[in-house]
């Protein structure tokens, strides 16, 4: 845990025995005067300084909040990925949220198993995927959470997001029918980016036609047939490098 998430910016202490207090005291072994990163979900990040540790283990702190830091913003890259097995989806969400993207949109693909959409992952109130996003925020020290949604089909996604698609640089990754290497595709810095990756069994011809009809370029990530979660990690990394989004991590001071 590199960042402690707060319920709101007014929090100034952690009661003894809470997960945050346990991590700070047992893992980081903090003392009065030590600092740690904290943040509010989709809000500010700040540097907390420990001001008191009570005999019972309650930790009090003050926070110097960052002002409009670019480090805590999500990149202008949206991920569209075909619905896969629940275990694979967990890996996709972990990779995408750690590397960084603005949204994770999932669609039921023509080659995918319809039963995957009945997984508890997609039930209202299930905390598995939100929990993965929370762990990624704590790991990356970035309190910004990507939004996510499940669409009933690729066609449904394309219809509902036509305006956004027209404003974005859209690339579909496909190992079997690419036009060129993703490395050779330019991404205009002033545009949002939309990356589309098929499900575990890939794209159908109808899905390819739908994407091409909406202005998607097709690209490959090399000759290796990658797992979906690996393709997600590679594609996002290449895209973020192309738009020069990366900035150095700030050290505690």
Q: Which role fits each region the language model picked out?
A:
Residues 205-253:
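Structured adenosyl-cofactor binding patch, chiefly the S-adenosyl-L-methionine
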Residues 14-16, 73-78, 191-194, 213-221:
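Glycine/charged-rich beta-loop-alpha catalytic/anionic-binding loops adjacent to active sites
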């Amino acid at each position: 845990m590199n960042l402690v998430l707060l319920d709101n910016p007014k929090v100034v202490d952690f009661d003894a025995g809470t997960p945050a207090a346990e991590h700070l005291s047992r893992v980081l072994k903090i003392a009065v005067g030590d600092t740690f990163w904290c943040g509010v979900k989709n809000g500010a990040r700040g540097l907390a300084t420990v001001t008191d540790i009570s005999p019972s283990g309650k930790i009090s702190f003050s926070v110097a909040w960052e002002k409009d830091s670019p480090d805590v913003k999500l990149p202008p890259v949206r991920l569209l990925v075909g619905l896969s097995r629940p275990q694979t989806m967990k890996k996709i969400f972990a990779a995408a949220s750690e590397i960084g993207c603005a949204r994770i949109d999932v669609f039921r693909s023509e080659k995918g198993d319809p039963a995957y959409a009945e997984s508890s992952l997609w039930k209202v109130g299930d905390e598995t995927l939100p929990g993965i996003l929370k762990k990624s925020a704590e790991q990356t020290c970035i309190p910004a959470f990507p939004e996510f949604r499940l669409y009933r089909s690729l066609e449904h996604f394309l219809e509902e997001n036509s305006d956004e698609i027209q404003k974005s640089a859209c690339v579909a990754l496909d190992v079997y029918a690419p036009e060129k290497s993703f490395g050779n595709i330019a991404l205009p810095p002033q545009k949002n980016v939309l990356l589309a990756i098929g499900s575990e069994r890939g794209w159908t011809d109808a899905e390819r036609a739908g994407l091409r009809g909406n202005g998607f370029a097709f690209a490959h990530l090399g000759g290796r047939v990658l797992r979906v979660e690996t393709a997600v990690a590679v594609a996002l990394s290449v895209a973020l490098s192309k738009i020069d989004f990366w900035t150095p991590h700030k050290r505690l001071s």
